[in-house]
């Protein structure tokens, strides 16, 4: 392990990102988000009033100084590709900066799509090698967090690692959804199990397990060797968590990087923020938290801005209707182009161009872009998908049986409404 002086670390913080390429795995289906991902990949799902989930990984790259980025796409990629083309065309080709869209090459006989996360990189190796990077940063495109990847790169170099895995403690009950590791005193990974049925607890804390975040730094040449060998292994599932990381661990070449060392947060005493938002409840909670008085995720930090595609929209408007009722909101996010007329909105997130007509009560709701809510509606604990038209007088979130019959209701009581569900409901009512 190499110990670096402060000036050396500052120099590396500038140099290492320039020697790196980031690969964002953005082809996931996100099946636990149910109908919300029927027509879009999970990284393209709207989040936080104006963003897409992938904007966080892309913004982290930009803010960390990594300006060579490959986005590996697959499932329902049109919306994602369109978003990146419109909102992330700021890089200069003359300066060797880019966001490259890398669809499935479908080069394997008998295989149409990527066989696993590692295969997603393998299929694009011919392109990736042309980047001539010394380090490859592998990222998931479907997580919400702020991280300075330059700090993780410095940690990788200091430890003399060939592979570094970002990690953080998670409740033991949630650890079955992650790769779980054990480390020694030097943070070398000595054991790694992907999504174990009985996760091993952290030493000294039976309530937590040390989980992989799916964020990796590799020496480029080492990664290429690993992927070439994995590609020829018929017994492999060609996945980083299931195959590549366990193999490196057995070889003693993998080190852990504690997420708090590179997490970007304005309050140093706050808990490091990282969310998977892979279920409807997690997605709903993470959105509504941003509307709270003190959100866990600081979206107002000008030193680490989250970038996205910005439409030219008029300001949000709150108006009095003809009866004299005022449009009001409390503890809510209301985006550009929204109009709230004579209704009350509480603890909710309204995406661009939402229209709420008179006499409505909106409470703990997430309304995606272009939702239109008719008069006298009551919406509670729900997610309304893009461009839904909620009929006059409709009540959602108050009757569990009725909600489950008409829409999708999760075990936690979160109701998801889509245009297709509303269309089917209308057909039934017209019979």
From Swiss-Prot:
InterPro entries: ADP-Glc_PPase, ADP_Glu_pyroP_CS, GlgC_bac, GlmU/GlgC-like_hexapep, NTP_transferase_dom, Nucleotide-diphossugar_trans, Trimer_LpxA-like_sf. GO terms for biological process: glycogen biosynthetic process. AMP binds at residues 40, 46, 52, 130, 370, 386. Beta-D-fructose 1,6-bisphosphate binds at residues 39, 419-423, 429-431. Allosterically activated by fructose-1,6-bisphosphate (F16BP) and inhibited by AMP. Involved in the biosynthesis of ADP-glucose, a building block required for the elongation reactions to produce glycogen. Catalyzes the reaction between ATP and alpha-D-glucose 1-phosphate (G1P) to produce pyrophosphate and ADP-Glc. NCBIfam families: glgC, PRK00725.1, PRK00844.1. Belongs to the bacterial/plant glucose-1-phosphate adenylyltransferase family. This is Glucose-1-phosphate adenylyltransferase.
């Amino acid at each position: 392990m190499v110990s670096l002086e402060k000036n050396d670390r500052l120099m590396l913080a500038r140099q290492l990102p320039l020697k790196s390429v980031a690969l964002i795995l953005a082809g996931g289906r996100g099946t636990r988000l149910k109908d919300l991902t029927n027509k879009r990949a999970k990284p393209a799902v709207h989040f936080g009033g104006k963003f897409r989930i992938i904007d966080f990984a892309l913004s982290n790259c930009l803010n960390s100084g990594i300006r060579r980025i490959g986005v590996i796409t697959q499932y329902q990629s049109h919306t994602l590709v369109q978003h990146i083309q419109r909102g992330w065309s700021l890089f200069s080709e003359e300066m060797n900066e880019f966001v490259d869209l890398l669809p499935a090459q479908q080069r394997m006989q008998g295989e149409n799509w990527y066989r696993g996360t590692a295969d997603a990189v393998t299929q694009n190796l011919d392109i990736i090698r042309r980047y001539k990077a010394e380090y490859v940063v592998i990222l998931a495109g479907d997580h919400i967090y702020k991280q300075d990847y330059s700090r993780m790169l410095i940690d990788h170099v200091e430890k003399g690692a060939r592979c570094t895995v970002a990690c953080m403690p998670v409740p033991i009950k949630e650890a079955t959804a992650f790769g779980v590791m054990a480390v020694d005193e030097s943070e070398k990974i000595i054991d790694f199990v992907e999504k174990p049925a009985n996760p091993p607890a952290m030493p000294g804390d039976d309530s937590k397990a040390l989980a992989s975040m799916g964020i990796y730094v590799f020496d480029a040449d080492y990664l290429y060797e690993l992927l070439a060998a994995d590609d020829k292994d018929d017994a492999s599932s060609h996945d980083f968590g299931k195959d590549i990381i366990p193999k490196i661990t057995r070889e003693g070449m993998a080190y852990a990087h504690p997420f708090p060392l590179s997490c970007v947060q304005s309050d140093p005493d706050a808990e490091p923020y990282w969310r998977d938002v892979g279920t409807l409840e997690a997605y709903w909670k993470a959105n509504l938290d941003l509307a709270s008085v003190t959100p866990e995720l600081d979206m107002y930090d000008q030193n680490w801005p989250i970038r996205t595609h910005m439409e030219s929209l008029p300001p949000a408007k709150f108006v009095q209707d003809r009866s004299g009722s005022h449009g009001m909101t409390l503890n809510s996010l209301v985006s550009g182009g929204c109009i709230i007329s004579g209704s009350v909105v509480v603890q909710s997130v309204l995406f661009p161009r939402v229209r709420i007509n008179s006499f409505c009560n909106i409470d703990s709701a997430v309304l995606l872009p272009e939702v239109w809510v008719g008069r006298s509606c009551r919406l509670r604990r729900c997610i309304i998908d893009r461009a839904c038209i909620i009929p006059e007088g409709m009540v959602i979130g108050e009757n569990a049986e009725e909600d489950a019959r008409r829409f999708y209701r999760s075990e936690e009581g979160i109701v998801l409404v889509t245009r297709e569900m509303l269309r089917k409901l209308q057909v039934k009512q017209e019979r």
